[in-house]
């Protein structure tokens, strides 16, 4: 009789171990991490030269984006 009780306990432990092993691991949310900010050095290095394509003034080395190109002067002929 004690063999059946021991067998039942072992089967239950085995089933619980399989359930724990098969459970998904919780993933760390990427929203909790702060994105790294660019240092002033890398911000300056990443700026685009005169004549490169741009979307706004902040992308150009001269801070002048005219007609989607980094410009040297404000007035365009």
Swiss-Prot record:
UniProt keyword list: Antibiotic, Antimicrobial, Cleavage on pair of basic residues, Disulfide bond, Secreted, Signal
InterPro entries (alphabetical): LEAP-2 (IPR009955)
Localization annotation: Secreted
GO BP, one annotated term: defense response to bacterium
Coiled coil: none
Keyword Nucleotidyltransferase: no
Family matches, as Gene3D superfamilies: 4.10.40.50
Disulfide bonds: 54-65, 60-70
Annotated signal sequence range: 1-22
Secreted recorded as keyword: yes
A cellular component term, taken from the record's GO annotations: extracellular region
Propeptide: 23-37
Function: Has an antimicrobial activity.
The family this protein is said to belong to: Belongs to the LEAP2 family.
Protein's name according to its UniProt entry: Liver-expressed antimicrobial peptide 2
Organism: Sus scrofa
Lineage, uppermost ranks: Eukaryota, Metazoa, Chordata, Craniata, Vertebrata
């Amino acid at each position: 009789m004690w063999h059946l009780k021991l067998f039942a306990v072992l089967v239950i432990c085995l089933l619980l171990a399989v359930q724990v092993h098969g459970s998904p691991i919780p993933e760390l949310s990427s929203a909790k991490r702060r994105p790294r900010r660019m240092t002033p050095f890398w911000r300056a290095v990443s700026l685009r030269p005169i004549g490169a394509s741009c979307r706004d003034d902040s992308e150009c080395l001269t801070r002048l984006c005219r007609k989607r190109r980094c410009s040297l002067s404000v007035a365009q002929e």
